[in-house]
Structure formats: C-alpha cells, structure tokens
Design a protein with these regions (language model features):
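Residues in intrinsically disordered, low-complexity segments of regulatory proteins
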Residues: 2-3, 43, 135
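Cysteine-based protein phosphatase catalytic domain of the PTP/DSP
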Residues: 20-22, 27-117, 139-169
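A phosphate-binding catalytic loop at a beta-strand-loop-alpha-helix junction
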Residues: 115-134
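Short, intrinsically disordered low-complexity segments
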Residues: 6, 12-15, 85, 127, ...
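Non-catalytic regulatory/accessory regions that flank a structured catalytic core
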Residues: 1-19, 178
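The feature captures the conserved acid-bearing segment of alpha/beta-hydrolase catalytic domains
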Residues: 168-177
C-alpha cells in the first residue's frame, strides 16, 4: 500500500519499518529510552542491551496503530524473564501526561529500585518517555529539571513536556527536596 491510499480504520499503521529495530539510547547504566519494541525485538533488547524490564507508556490507540497486543507483549516478556509494566499515557496530551505522571514515575521507580536495567518507551521515544525519564532523573539523581533535561538531551533528542514537569515538581532550576 502506498502513502496516499487510505487504509481501513482497523488496519495497523506502524510508524517504523517492518524490519527495523527500535532506536535505543542509554541514559544511565540502568535506564534506556527508545522507540517501541515489537515481539521480535524483545529477545534482541535482552541480548544486545541486557534489558531486564520494559516500561511501556503506549496507550491502547498506540498499540493498535502499531499492530501490538499487550497480552502478547506481556507473555513474551514473561517467557524471556523480562518484567513488563505498562502505564498508558495518551500521545501528545500534556493533560494526560500531567494526570498520569506520578503513576508513571512510581512505576519506573519501582522497576529501578528492583535493580533492573529498564527500557522505557512510548512510540518514538521523543516525548512521553523522555518526560518521565527527566522527571525520574530530577527526583532520584539530585538534578534540577534543567540539569536533567540537558543531561537527557545529550544522550537522546527529544521534546519533553517541561511545563508538565514544572507543574509537578516546581521551578526548572530547583533541586529536588530531600
């Protein structure tokens, strides 16, 4: 099918090429951020990047568009010994990010506390996952939001919801409360 022919509404329209692997960026020794994985990418993530946990921020629409099934992802992760956590956040919605940020941070923190090597992803790894990762860096690595954002952007291009993070944590220049 070409770019101009409308696909049926129920047909998946993956944002990645059929045979390409997800782009992965190492943010810290135990936190990686990137594009969504397919079932066929899970073992590759485990072997190539030593991933032991996946934190998925895709909502149901994202899963459908990309031809993914949560139960299949969860089952394959279980078979491979990878912990799978999903915190769905609607793509492009600052309001949904603000509403779900605390839950996403708690889920990520739980994985990181478990001494896992975590792969955090949304669709493209450009907005939702970076926002959560920057918030986690701020809260757990003694960085201001500004420092956390610059640290992250040195490792991966992104467009995080900084206004959501400021609304949640306070000023960009403020270090986390101890």
């Amino acid at each position: 099918m070409d770019w101009w022919t409308k696909r049926p509404d129920n047909e998946p329209r993956s944002i990645r090429g059929r045979y390409s692997r997800p782009a992965v960026s190492e943010i810290t020794d135990d936190l990686l951020v990137g594009e969504y994985p397919r079932l066929s990418d899970l073992d590759w993530l485990k072997q190539e990047y030593r991933v032991s946990a996946i934190h998925n921020l895709q909502d149901d629409i994202d899963l459908h568009i990309n031809g993914l099934d949560e139960a299949e992802l969860r089952n394959e992760c279980g078979r491979l010994g990878i912990t799978f956590v999903r915190t769905p956040i609607h793509d492009g919605s600052a309001d949904d990010m603000a509403a779900r940020l605390e839950h996403a941070l708690q889920d990520l923190d739980g994985l990181m506390d478990g001494e896992k090597r975590v792969f955090l992803h949304c669709n493209g790894g450009l907005n939702r996952a970076p926002t959560v990762a920057i918030g986690w860096l701020h809260a757990n690595r003694d960085m201001s939001l500004e420092e956390a954002m610059h640290y992250f952007k040195q490792r991966r291009p992104c467009g995080p919801f900084m206004t959501v993070l400021e609304g949640h944590f306070g000023s960009r220049d403020q270090k986390p409360a101890k």
